[in-house]
């Protein structure tokens, strides 16, 4: 069995997702925690990519672009061999508003939005994309996207099983 790991340091940054999430620690501890993850995992052969966030809520802000740039640059001081990503998700009609944030990543992570790949490629031809979360029911469609478009480099299914955290999502 071979596994590919996207090593993700934060589920959120400064905006509240839950009562006890990382937002209260982000300003003071983000670089320390990022450094600890990088140094702990940099020799693991399964880790192919570093992720600096998952569906962060402040993704439209200029401040988020700055934080992403700072974290990406910091990662590159420790490990220049692996790409940096972040899982972006949106249910807005103005997906293009995320282009400044997406431009801070080597691979742009799309959660449930790989159908935007072709139009995004036409708009931003240099962008490399992967689906960082997808439904199991979409695995064949997503596999075809990887096969047909060289700028789509993979698909990660979330999740193939049901569990208490998000029951029903594995269907």
Task: Identify the meaning behind each predicted range.
Residues 143-171:
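Aromatic/acidic polysaccharide-binding cleft in carbohydrate-active enzymes
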Residues 126-127, 148:
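Glycine-rich, phosphate-binding/catalytic loops in enzymes
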Residues 84-86, 130-131, 152-157:
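Acidic/polar loop patches that form or flank catalytic/metal-binding clefts of enzymes
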Residues 1-118, 123-126, 133-136, 140:
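Active-site mouth of glycoside hydrolases
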């Amino acid at each position: 069995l071979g596994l590919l790991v996207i090593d993700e340091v934060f589920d959120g940054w400064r905006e509240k997702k839950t009562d006890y999430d990382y937002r209260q620690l982000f300003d003071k501890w983000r670089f320390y925690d990022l450094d600890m993850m990088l140094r702990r995992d940099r020799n693991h052969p399964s880790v192919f990519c570093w992720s600096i966030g998952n569906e962060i809520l402040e993704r439209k802000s200029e401040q988020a672009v700055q934080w992403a740039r700072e974290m990406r640059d910091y990662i590159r001081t420790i490990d220049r061999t692996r790409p940096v990503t972040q899982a972006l998700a949106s249910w807005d009609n103005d997906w293009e508003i995320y282009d400044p944030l997406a431009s801070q990543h080597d691979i742009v992570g799309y959660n449930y939005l790989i159908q935007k790949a072709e139009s995004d490629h036409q708009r931003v031809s240099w962008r490399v994309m992967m689906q960082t979360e997808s439904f199991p029911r979409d695995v064949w469609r997503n596999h075809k996207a990887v096969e047909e478009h060289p700028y789509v480099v993979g698909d990660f299914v979330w999740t193939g099983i049901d569990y208490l955290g998000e029951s029903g999502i594995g269907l």
